[in-house]
């Protein structure tokens, strides 16, 4: 049995002792030692944990610097007012008829260079009506498309019916047996 057990080769072994608990009789397993070591590290780093955001993994702790999280929050807060300014330029929001707005440089400056929103994205006045008319034309086209599809598959269906009649002497359209090679018996369910 000794040939199947692999002995670990440890060059510099460091023993871990838990000073908070009195030594127990018997022996400690590796899992218990690792658990105690993790608790000890957690207690020793508790003062650091308050100042940083961190993610505790099994083998290590990932520390997120507060500087990065604060800058992301500030960027989001800066984007919210600029998006609101672009949304207020929407002519559909007003109760009057839709009319095209003149180019406004303050809107582009407020949206920023990275998040630049074109005037056509902020202006839905003329495009909204075009989309509705396109939708109506698509509905009328779908009826003609259905008839084209039926015409396309009609010849294939007729060919399949002829093949079935020749092979099995049964008309699947009218559900009637035909005289020929097979004798059909009606079964009552």
From Swiss-Prot:
InterPro entries linked: CDI_dom (IPR003175), CDI_dom_sf (IPR044898), KRP (IPR044275)
Tagged with keyword DNA damage: no
Region entry Disordered, spans: 73-107
Disulphide bridges: none
Ranges of compositional bias, category Polar residues: 73-93
Subcellular location: Nucleus, Nucleoplasm
Record-linked Pfam families: CDI
Annotated tissue distribution: Expressed in flowers and at lower levels in roots and leaves.
GO terms, molecular function: chromatin DNA binding; cyclin-dependent protein serine/threonine kinase inhibitor activity
Protein family per UniProt: Belongs to the CDI family. ICK/KRP subfamily.
Cited function: Inhibits CYCD2-1/CDKA-1 complex kinase activity without interaction with the complex.
Known partners and oligomeric status: Interacts with CYCD4-1. Does not interact with CDKA-1.
UniProt-recorded name of the protein: Cyclin-dependent kinase inhibitor 5
Phylogenetic classification of the source organism: Eukaryota, Viridiplantae, Streptophyta, Embryophyta, Tracheophyta
Gene transcribed to yield this protein: KRP5
């Amino acid at each position: 049995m000794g040939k199947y057990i692999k002995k670990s080769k440890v060059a510099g072994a460091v023993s871990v002792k838990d000073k908070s608990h009195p030594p127990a009789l018997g022996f400690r397993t590796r899992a218990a030692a690792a658990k105690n070591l993790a608790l000890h590290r957690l207690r020793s780093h508790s003062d650091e944990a308050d100042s940083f955001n961190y993610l505790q993994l099994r083998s290590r702790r990932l520390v997120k610097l507060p500087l990065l999280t604060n800058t992301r929050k500030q960027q989001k807060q800066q984007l919210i007012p600029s998006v609101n300014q672009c949304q207020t330029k929407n002519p559909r929001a007003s109760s009057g008829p839709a009319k095209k707005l003149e180019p406004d440089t303050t809107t582009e400056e407020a949206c920023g260079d990275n998040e630049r929103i074109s005037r056509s994205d902020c202006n839905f006045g003329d495009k909204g009506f075009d989309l509705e008319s396109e939708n109506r034309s698509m509905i009328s086209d779908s009826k003609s498309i259905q008839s084209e599809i039926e015409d396309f598959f009609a010849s294939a269906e007729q060919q399949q019916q002829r093949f079935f009649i020749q092979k099995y002497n049964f008309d699947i359209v009218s559900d009637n047996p035909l005289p020929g090679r097979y004798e059909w018996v009606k079964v009552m369910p």
